From Swiss-Prot:
It comes from Methanococcus maripaludis (strain C6 / ATCC BAA-1332). SUPFAM superfamilies: P-loop containing nucleoside triphosphate hydrolases. Residues 8-95 form the ATP-cone domain. Catalyzes the phosphorylation of 2-phosphoglycerate to 2,3-diphosphoglycerate. Involved in the biosynthesis of cyclic 2,3-bisphosphoglycerate, a thermoprotectant. The lineage of its organism: Archaea, Methanobacteriati, Methanobacteriota, Methanomada group, Methanococci. GO terms for molecular function: ATP binding; kinase activity; phosphotransferase activity, carboxyl group as acceptor. This is 2-phosphoglycerate kinase.
């Protein structure tokens, strides 16, 4: 079968552009609304089959949305149907900023990309890349902690000879000094996204509730999520898995594991102080589902219209 034969002959029309019907795109939307991935793809395939049997060659996004909604209602998926419409509306009308924080190795990048896929958000930015940009504009002499890892930044602190050297307080102070300049870049991206009306997911160690500007915590479309791992064994296994697919040396993480644990606990405490959800990231699928539930709840606060009257696909 050629590539062209895989493209649906059904055209979905919109005010701005037309595109072929996509089972994958619809299945992703249904999955984000809470349907199991296998069920969502099956339903998307059935909807495409029904359209083909009815010889529908062109359908508006609005009509397709209604068909999907009523199909869900008829299959006793009323809750998923309402979420499906809610997500389509909110993502169309509002820029959504999702911030996924957590210490090294807890899985922020994996969860961020999963959320982006489910939500159809095209941009995922890791805070490590923001740190690299900040390094180009801030000299090492000015902020040496920025040029260290989050868990070794304390070694670059300027200390008096009589200061205690290797303590939890020093580790966390170094971490804070490492994070502060990166937060400037993070906040700039958030501000620009809000101004331009674009959605983005940012992920990484540098997203620390309480250290970021207070205004972001009160914005309904800026959503903070914090990931954690309580099990040392699981956390270490994540580093082992990471080392197999990247150039990051496992030994460096394990040598500094106690400091990474301290940073993890610090971020968790900061999250709780600022009413940010803390999610145990043992199972990727369960974590993604929990994150989607939290995001959906926030979406409900952004929704100010009757669902069925929406003209959004």
């Amino acid at each position: 079968m050629t590539f062209d034969e895989n493209i649906s002959r059904i055209l979905v029309t919109d005010k701005e552009y037309d595109m072929p019907f996509s089972k994958g795109l619809l299945a992703r939307s249904l999955s984000a609304a809470g349907m199991k991935p296998s069920e969502s793809y099956t339903l998307a395939r059935e909807i495409e089959r029904d359209l083909n049997e009815q010889n529908v060659l062109k359908i508006s996004k609005d009509e397709l949305r209604r068909r999907v909604y009523y199909t869900l209602i008829n299959r006793d998926y009323e809750g998923i149907g309402e979420k499906y419409l809610l997500w389509r509306r909110v993502l169309k009308k509002h820029s959504i900023i999702i911030l996924v924080g957590g210490s090294s190795g807890v899985g922020t990048s994996t969860i961020a990309f999963e959320l982006a896929s489910r939500l159809g958000i095209p941009s995922v930015i890791g805070t490590d890349s923001i740190r690299e940009v900040m390094r180009r504009s801030i000299s090492k002499d000015l902020v040496p902690m920025l040029y260290e890892s989050s868990y070794t930044a304390w070694t670059a602190l300027r200390r008096s000879p009589w200061d205690e050297q290797d303590t939890k307080e020093m580790h966390l102070l170094g971490f804070e000094r490492h994070v502060e300049p990166v937060l400037l870049g993070i906040e700039s991206i958030i501000d620009r996204s809000l101004t331009e009306g674009t959605s983005v997911i940012l992920e990484g160690t540098h997203i620390v509730p309480g250290l970021m500007g207070e205004k972001y915590h009160s914005m309904p479309n800026v959503i903070f999520l914090n990931l954690t791992l309580s099990s040392e064994e699981t956390h270490k296994k994540r580093f082992t898995a990471r080392a197999k697919v990247s150039d990051r040396p496992l030994e460096r993480y394990l040598e500094n594991f106690e400091i990474i644990k301290e940073i993890n606990q610090y971020i968790v405490e900061k999250s709780k102080e600022n009413n940010v959800p803390v999610i145990e990231n043992v199972s990727i699928s369960e974590t993604v589902q929990k994150c989607l539930e939290i995001v959906t709840e926030r979406f409900s606060n952004l929704n100010d219209e009757p669902i069925i009257d929406s003209d959004i696909y």
